[in-house]
């Protein structure tokens, strides 16, 4: 059984490491994979590793559907991106997607965003 997860017990790994062990060791066959916010368990670096796993899965003939708030996972090349607006799914590009734009705004204006968020609204 341990060989199915890379030879290490899932209980001896962090949450993110156990997720990556599942992806890389158990989900190898061609299939349809559906994930709901996999980034919740994955560090930034493991999100990058997840992109590599996605490429390997797609190259093996798999299809992957992901609900995500991660600009890293959203950046998968040639991904078809949908956003829900007023209960309707609409296609969008990476650069136009609010997930990317919001993260970019934070990263490029971190100090201002933090100042505004943590300011005393009673002053």
What residue ranges belong to the model's regions?
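Structural recognition of the conserved hydrophobic beta-strand(s) that form the central parallel beta-sheet
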Residues: 34-36, 63-68
